Amino acid sequence: NKYFGGEDEINKKRSEWAKKHLVVLAEGDKKKPTLTVIDRGEGQSPERIQNSIVHLSGSIKRNVDFVFGKYHQGGSAAIRFCGSKAKCYQLVLSRRAETIADKSKPNDYGWTLVRRNYKSRTAFYEYCTDRDGNTFSFKFEKPLKIDGIDIEFADGCLIRLYDYYLDNP
């Protein structure tokens, strides 16, 4: 290809891009590992997490073609394969990308723990907030080191799925 190189060159560029922007880690038990997915996309600020990443019934994703949640492939689709009825958890950690963050506010990390609750006839999802109903947050001082490996998380979104059921690992 005149502008992008041949197929090998295009695949090499895609691979290099993916290494920088998308990470999938598995640890623990082979049939029920803890999976960590890091997407170094735009991320969300703590005050936006409740209306975006963990929001199930809103229309925020309807007009955005590239988000998984629009196609029911986001976090709520994955959590049903986590753990057991007694413990079904997913960690959400996010920080807005510096290039699009609101410069008038601190650009902190936000986090919550999501669980699928089976205490009624119909299971439902719920997530943790502080006592005022806000998403938990902490100051950004430097990128977080992930599990002692050579990966740093500065912004984007990290989803950790605990005891994820893999039928055929």
Residue ranges of model-derived segments:
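Short helix N-cap motif at coil->helix boundaries in the Bergerat
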Residues: 43-51
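Short, charged/polar micro-motifs that form catalytic or ligand-binding hotspots
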Residues: 38-43, 64-68, 72
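ATP-lid-like helix-loop hinge signature
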Residues: 1-40
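Short, flexible loop/turn elements at secondary-structure junctions
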Residues: 26-28, 39-44, 57-60, 77-82, ...
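Bergerat-fold ATP-binding/catalytic subdomain of histidine kinases
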Residues: 52-68
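GHKL-type ATPase core
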Residues: 66-169
